[in-house]
Amino acid sequence: MIILKIFKNKVFLGIVSIIIFSLVIFSYSKIKAYNVLKDVFVFSKDNIVSIWRVKKDEDSHDYNYKLASNEIDALSSILINSKLKKATTSDSPSNTLGSMTILLDGKIKEENDSVSASFERGITLTPIDKDSVYVFLEINKPTYDDSFNMDLVMQKSYIIDSSKLVEFINENT
């Protein structure tokens, strides 16, 4: 009877240990993903490679849009303090009119009237309605081979409910 009781306790402890270990691993991956996302939104004028915008009333692109330092700080602050909701492909806007793409930490090359960009972080912001913005994040890793090649690390889509962010994008597109 004592042996049976000890065996049951060891089995119980083993199961509890496996569950706790699994939760620790799961929590670590979630915390790591959260920290990566929050770091993506921290930027300043110094690490912006280029800002691309698509005007909302016409299908024209501006590949060298400029924001003032205080506007960049305000945008970064809005993004850092926003709550992210995971988005699906069905949440994606049907067109990109009125969107803004911010390319961070990289370089840009212009040749023969074409523009090529190499960047570590890309944030595309497209208003969905007056209170929500579809956010497409792209994180790349440089190949360090003196080319413009990058290795894709992550692409994620989110929705941010923020009328301030919608207003900011509308003012700048």
Where are these regions (language model features)?
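Short, Lys/Arg-rich N-terminal segment immediately upstream of the first membrane anchor
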Residues: 1-9
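Function-determining sites in protein domains
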Residues: 8-16, 21-173
